[in-house]
């Protein structure tokens, strides 16, 4: 069975491509993946946001979709926030870890202090994750994400639960 890899390009896509510096094929890929279901006007708006915040939809730093009321929702992911942070001269790194039931863990937000240790014994179930964003010109930002609150049982959460909850904590810390 042969797959058809042709890309259909409309005059609207050509105009959008010209306006935002993408090729016609790239606009088609964006409109059928990370901006699926958007109208030409919504796609133009989305690409303008991508350009203005300097985030790349091809590596899922930013994407959009339509909700059940047909509203356009635009999201920046953890990789988008990390890309923006890495361009900042004050960014000095990020550290994160999942927290499990058998870990020794304490968090003192007022004093920007986390103590987290675990050994080689069974760590137990994941209960959350934390992230610390370090800045050269200020205090670190610490965020904690509760696993039960964020885990909705989607496939990625089933196969990579530690990575998913760390991404949530990192996103919250990077946003600040």
Task: Give, region by region, the residue ranges found by the protein language model.
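Binding-interface segments
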Residues: 2-176
């Amino acid at each position: 069975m042969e797959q058809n890899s042709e890309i259909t390009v409309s005059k609207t896509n050509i105009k959008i491509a010209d306006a935002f510096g993408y090729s016609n094929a790239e606009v088609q890929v964006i409109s059928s993946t990370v901006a699926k279901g958007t109208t030409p006007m919504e796609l133009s708006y989305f690409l303008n946001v991508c350009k203005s915040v300097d985030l790349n939809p091809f590596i899922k730093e930013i994407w959009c979709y339509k909700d059940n009321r047909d509203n356009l929702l635009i999201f920046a992911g953890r990789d988008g926030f990390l890309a923006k942070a890495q361009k900042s001269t004050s960014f000095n790194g990020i550290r994160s870890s999942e927290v499990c039931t058998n870990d020794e863990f304490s968090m003192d937000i007022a004093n920007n202090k986390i103590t987290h240790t675990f050994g080689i014994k069974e760590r137990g179930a994941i209960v959350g994750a934390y992230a610390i964003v370090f800045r050269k010109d200020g205090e670190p930002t610490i965020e904690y994400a509760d696993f039960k609150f964020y885990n909705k049982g989607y496939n990625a959460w089933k196969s990579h639960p530690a990575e998913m909850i760390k991404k949530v904590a990192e996103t919250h810390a990077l946003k600040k």
